[in-house]
């Protein structure tokens, strides 16, 4: 699944020796980095057979720049859609923030002065599988990225052979209780299920919105998403998409005997 999505090796004017480290070994090391949040300098390259830390890091930087992990998620969603594993009856959106200890594009979250933070917002289907993901500064209101979050849901194949990117309903908490968000859902023909400020209780997540919280906990299983150590936004987003790819792959029917750790 990954090999057809990889970009060709970069060419240099001076030439050079061909690559001897396999893409599979580098991918295993990158997945280890995402799961454990180990510093690059402490990567056990001998266990994965990926040559050196520099070789693995360069391969990851090339793949992140080429958008390999985003395209991998689309390919996995296509397989899940054809197998009937996606629940389009509803989609739930939520966000979570994390510290950016080395700075980078972002902002300070209100109420937490002195801490640079970023915010990640996943959109999940009725079963909790991530369909889209956005990474923004922590001081940006959730409602401002609502349209972009739903608009990033790719057109996924269905068991009937067509493609679909529009859910029947959208569930969200009070952070998305804006006229802009409700109007956007109405224009797209999506039923509005957004908690209203001053009406719905904050003590309960509801019968469906809890799945977004559960998906956030699943994503946090990749420790690289608990604290941001990467200064480069492109590489951090690649790690976030890799966490989504891991969830999608483990839901495939063929992955019952070969689940990713």
Could you say what each language-model-derived stretch is?
Residues 1-261:
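Short alpha-helical elements
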């Amino acid at each position: 699944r990954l090999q057809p999505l990889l970009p060709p090796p970069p060419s240099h004017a001076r030439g050079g020796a061909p690559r001897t480290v396999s893409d599979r070994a580098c991918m295993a090391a990158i997945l280890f980095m995402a799961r454990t949040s180990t510093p690059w300098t402490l990567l056990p390259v001998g266990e994965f057979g990926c040559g050196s830390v520099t070789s693995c890091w360069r391969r990851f930087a090339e793949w992140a720049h080429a958008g390999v992990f985003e395209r991998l998620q689309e390919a996995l969603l296509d397989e899940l859609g054809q197998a009937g594993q996606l629940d389009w009856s509803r989609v739930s959106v939520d966000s979570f923030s994390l510290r950016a200890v080395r700075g980078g594009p972002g902002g300070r979250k209100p109420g937490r002065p002195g801490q640079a933070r970023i915010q990640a917002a996943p959109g999940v289907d009725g079963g909790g599988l991530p369909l889209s993901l956005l990474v923004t500064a922590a001081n940006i209101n959730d409602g401002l990225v609502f349209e972009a979050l739903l608009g990033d849901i790719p057109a996924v194949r269905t068991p009937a052979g067509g493609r679909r990117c529009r859910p029947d309903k959208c569930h969200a908490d009070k952070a998305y209780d804006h006229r802009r968000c409700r109007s956007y859902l109405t224009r797209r023909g999506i039923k509005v299920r957004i908690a209203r400020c001053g009406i719905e209780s904050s003590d309960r997540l509801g019968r469906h919105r809890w799945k977004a919280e559960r998906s956030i906990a699943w994503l946090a299983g990749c420790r690289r998403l608990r604290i941001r150590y990467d200064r480069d936004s492109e590489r951090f987003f690649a790690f976030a998409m890799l966490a989504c790819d891991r969830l999608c792959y483990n839901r495939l029917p063929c992955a019952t005997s070969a689940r990713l750790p």
